[in-house]
Every structure is written in structure tokens, then in C-alpha cells.
Regions:
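Conserved Walker B
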Residues: 29, 54-55, 90-91
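Switch II (G3) loop of P-loop NTPases
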Residues: 17-36
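Inter-motif core of Ras-like GTPase G domains
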Residues: 34-57, 65-78, 84-87
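Anionic-ligand binding region
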Residues: 61
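Catalytic P-loop NTPase motifs of RecA-like helicase/translocase cores
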Residues: 32, 58, 94
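Conserved GTP-binding G-domain of TRAFAC-class P-loop NTPases and closely related GTPase folds
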Residues: 66-146
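Switch I (effector-binding) loop of TRAFAC-class P-loop GTPase G-domains
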Residues: 1-18, 131-134
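Core residues of folded domains in eukaryotic genome-function proteins
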Residues: 2-6, 19-24, 44-48, 80-84, ...
Length: 146
């Protein structure tokens, strides 16, 4: 299991005159063994698409929330204000959970992580930034979905 890389030119870029800038996409699977690869590519990221399996969500909810929390609190993501899109895959399946359900469950799990990690002294937290950023981000997401 490894990440996939590709570069391509957007159709809108092809129509422009002058220098055409390709988009570089890196697909890093959510397996724990590949987390170091994510740390390697995040500082260069202009955006993150975090994919959640809507059909098999409950069995992977804690792991997904933990991975999302780690991604959202990385210094490189916070400092550069990297846009994060949470994408629910397999929503066309009959047994898939709704995006609203997934959003609420992820928020609950992330809040659990925040509370437990806030209890740890700041001296013990490594490579994490102010968790207030995460709170503002969640409020922003809530405001846009209402």
C-alpha cells in the first residue's frame, strides 16, 4: 500500500494563454502505516480532501475522526489555513449513512479528542497547535451547512 501521485492540467487552465500550471494530486490512503507520508506532503498542500466511507462509517468512525483531528491540528495545515473538504464516499448505496449523520458523529468524536487532549498539559503535546482553531473551523462548517 502506497500513495498515488499524478499531475494534470485543469480544462480551465488549458484555455488560458501563457504559462499553464498543472495540479499535483497526492492520494494518501488512511492506513496508519502511511501517516508519516501525510506529514511529508501536508506542508506543500493547498487543500485536503478527506474521504470518509459513508457505507461502512460506524466501524471506522473513531479511526476516521482521529485521523481527521490529527490532520486538522497539524501546524502546516493551521498556519497556511489549508482548506479541508470532508467527502462522503458511497452515498449512493442503500445502507450508506447521510452526510448530516456523519458530520454530527465526526464532530462528537473530535470534541472527545479535544477534551481529552486539552486535559494533557501543553508541554506534553507535540506538533499540535492551538485547538481553538479547530473550534472555529467546526463553527464555520456548521454555519455553512445551515
Amino acid at each position: 500500500m502506497e500513495e498515488n501521485n499524478d499531475k494534470f492540467v485543469l480544462n480551465s487552465e488549458k484555455e488560458r494563454k501563457g504559462k499553464v500550471k498543472p495540479v499535483h494530486i497526492v492520494d494518501v490512503p488512511g492506513h496508519a502505516r502511511l501517516k508519516p507520508k501525510l506529514d511529508e506532503v501536508l506542508p506543500k498542500a493547498a487543500g485536503v480532501v478527506f474521504v470518509v466511507d459513508a457505507q461502512d462509517f460506524l466501524s471506522s468512525m473513531q479511526a476516521a475522526a482521529d485521523y481527521l483531528y490529527d490532520t486538522l491540528t497539524k501546524a502546516s495545515v493551521v498556519k497556511k489555513k489549508v482548506h479541508v473538504l470532508i467527502f462522503c464516499n458511497k452515498t449512493d448505496k442503500v445502507t450508506a449513512h447521510s452526510k448530516e449523520f456523519i458530520k454530527k458523529q465526526l464532530e462528537k468524536e473530535i470534541n472527545k479528542f479535544r477534551e481529552s487532549r486539552n486535559a494533557i498539559s501543553s508541554a506534553e503535546i507535540s506538533d499540535e497547535v492551538n485547538l481553538g482553531y479547530l473550534e472555529r473551523l467546526l463553527k464555520s462548517v456548521n454555519a455553512r451547512t445551515r
